[in-house]
Amino acid sequence: MAKIRIHEIAKELGYDSKEIIEKANELGLGIKTASNAVEPEIAAAIYEYIQTREIPEAFKKNIKTPTAKKPKKENIKEQEKLNESEKKEPKKEEKLKQEVKKEELKIEKENAKEEEKQEIIDAHKPQSLASATLAKRRGLVIVKKKKDEEEIQVKKEEVKNSNDISINNEERLSLKTMFSNADESLKKKKKEKKSFVASKKESTEKMNFLDEHDFGDISLDDEDEVVLPDFSVKEQEKPQNINKKQPNFIRQAVGNSAGFGFEGGIQRRSRKKPSKKIEKKEVEEVGSVAISKEIRVYEFADKIGKSTSEVISKLFMLGMMTTKNDFLDEDAIEILAAEFGIEINIINEADEFDYVKDYEEETDEKDLVTRAPVITIMGHVDHGKTSLLDYIRKSRVASGEAGGITQHVGAYMVEKNGRKITFIDTPGHEAFTAMRARGASITDIVIIVVAADDGVKPQTKEAINHAKAAGVPIIIAINKMDKEAANPDMVKTQLAEMEIMPVEWGGSYEFVGVSAKTGMGIEDLLEIVLLQADILELKANPKSFAKASIIESSVQKGRGAVATVIVQNGTLTVGSTVVAGEAYGKVRAMSDDQGKALKEIKPGECGVIVGLSEVADAGEILIAVKTDKEAREYANKRHEYNRQKELSKSTKVSIDELGAKIKEGNLKALPVILKADVQGSLEALKASLEKLRNDEIKVNIIHSGVGGITQSDIELASASENSIVLGFNIRPTGEVKERAKDKGVEIKTYNVIYNLLDDVKALLGGMMSPIISEEQLGQAEIRQVINVPKIGQIAGCMVTEGVINRGAKIRLIRDGVVVYEGNVSSLKRFKDDAKEVAKGYECGVGIEGCDDMRVGDYIESYKEVEEQASL
């Protein structure tokens, strides 16, 4: 049999040759170089020693230094190995028997009393791979009861030193036994790492199930062993292939030799590489899964244990074209859960950075004080809302407004009878619906102003609906009572039809006749407001952290981002750290509506604050927090969340919408860059411009923002074809004008919303295809057809209606059906050419390209008129 060199063993095991030499010398082999060769049995022993870190039985006598004291190896185990060797090597049977007898005599002389204890230890020794697999397959385990009083002690003896390296046949284990023991040891070590084994080691010990046990005579009370099912064995687990991979150097050595420890020898390994077996992973059933309200496709797939492609294909089958980064709405999540058969629990991920939800209002009754009421004035445009507030404030706001209409939300403080009242003035124009809705949502009482001479108008109805939706009390102020055409009864009747019944008519709504010009009824109106506020019992805690609503925000030169706020709870002071949506910062300065500096704003009061990092959205809730770090974290999380959501929306489209998108691609668009002075006006303008569209044209707002027109806006406009820059209540500076002139960018600025919308409508109308209409000119009857050589047919006609013009478009009509359309090629009156022939005259008409004229046909003359389209 071929010997195996040390470097081959090192290569097979992936070790350095020096390490293999050291391990071999530890076994007493005396290896000096990597080229030294050893027998296959010794190579197998080295392999076992390196893998298990345990010295093989056959080499214990070869070690010169005394080993650590260990219990003596069992005699029964050696006998089993010898018996197995006898079966597999019948030729060496006689020799093995003699050696077994000698070994037995030695064991009996050494210690005959240890036989019983050795049998007990035998149960703990590593079993062969076949035994372990079979016991696992049967699913049973023999449990040995614990007895604290019995402690098994094994006598130890010193191993005799031996200088001669002689490996007897009884000490040479077969390759199969060696590797089965080594593999079993590794397998046992791996099992010990698993968590479920730790709990079993406390009370049970596995016995050799293949040994002979009389299970029929087992008693649970008297006996030490109990047969129990082994729950660590899976029922569905299939027995794995017992064959283990052997080292290449063993296969090379015994490849051609039959009968070495195996019946029939070892089969030659095929050169063909075995096909890789793909282990089928057990699909775990997913129970109830927590899914965030806003989740991307790939995140949803990870949550439910599916591949992203599988989820996308399912969405495609449901009619949704998505990418893995798109967000899923609640309906899509529920449909997918039903398709995959998964129970889900939808949670709102935005709660993690919902600073409003985290805000804790202290409700200690001792700290609650009466706060100022917040009153919102609403109504139709030009019904006198701002004029009424001007009289109350003794100011002239209305006279300074562009176009005589309010285009911003204003907050003002008024003191009446030593009590403060906060007023919010909202625009009445239809474009400012969102502003009115915000005003109604943060107010305590709503005053609806109706002109006595004009009655209920569309925005009046809308304001009433906003107030009802907010659930706040309504007071009706009938304005312009000083006019001769004033008719308050008409107003009451119209409002009664909307279920706004006056108190004097048996209803529950207060009606007050006022005049913003003369001051009539103003005192009565304020008295009713304070009375209503007392009924509501408006209270707040001024000692807690501030909570306020932003009703308007803008950028002011020299001050940066400013915001008009109304404090709802707590006290907002200079130096407070605040967060509002994506904006955060420390309040650097505060002022009232008159521009007077303030140190604090109490509940129910309004003011203007400076110090935010950016322009906050109108309608956001502003909260005071403890630290700047906390405010920054809230704002950054909100910014990232909104950004990801916006990016996702730009890509998501359903199959049903795809056709509309393709059709929309044929639309002509007017690219617009929109800048305004405040956030509320910008919001209103965007909403109004987006409504200016039809099947042919639309407005495309490529950028919008609060503040003045900058050079970056000009650069963006120059990069976009045919785009214009629209400014509302702002003016470009000299540098910006020069840059726009150089780039050929047109800038238009306005201070009245009517004018801006009208100009955009005109621009859109110029881009639309003109409307083509027909204008009938005349009609002639053909009475004779003359064929002229080289020219064709000439029709002799009588003009019966209007005139026939040379070069005009004509239709040839036969029996009421148009048979030809073309142009007049020649027109003559007798022999002379004519430009036109009027009704009642005869003429000769030549039609270009027509040779099928008949007597009795009619020639109809017309012209096409183009009209400019408008929205």
From Swiss-Prot:
The keyword Cytoplasm applies. Residues 425-428 are annotated as: G3. Keywords: Cytoplasm, GTP-binding, Initiation factor, Nucleotide-binding, Protein biosynthesis. It comes from the Bacteria. Residues 479-482 are annotated as: G4. This is Translation initiation factor IF-2. Residues 404-408 are annotated as: G2. InterPro entries: EF-G-like_DII (IPR053905), EFTu-like_2 (IPR004161), IF2_II (IPR044145), IF2_N (IPR006847), P-loop_NTPase (IPR027417), Small_GTP-bd (IPR005225), T_Tr_GTP-bd_dom (IPR000795), TF_IF2_bacterial-like (IPR000178). Residues 61-72 have a biased composition (Basic residues). GTP binds at residues 379-386, 425-429, 479-482. Residues 515-517 are annotated as: G5. Its main location: cytoplasm. It comes from Campylobacter jejuni subsp. jejuni serotype O:2 (strain ATCC 700819 / NCTC 11168). Residues 73-101 have a biased composition (Basic and acidic residues). Residues 379-386 are annotated as: G1. Residues 60-101 are annotated as: Disordered. Belongs to the TRAFAC class translation factor GTPase superfamily. Classic translation factor GTPase family. IF-2 subfamily. One of the essential components for the initiation of protein synthesis. Protects formylmethionyl-tRNA from spontaneous hydrolysis and promotes its binding to the 30S ribosomal subunits. Also involved in the hydrolysis of GTP during the formation of the 70S ribosomal complex. GO terms for molecular function: GTP binding; GTPase activity; translation initiation factor activity. The gene is infB. GO terms for cellular component: cytosol. It is found in: Cytoplasm. Residues 370-537 form the tr-type G domain. CDD domains: IF2_eIF5B (cd01887), IF2_mtIF2_II (cd03702), mtIF2_IVc (cd03692).
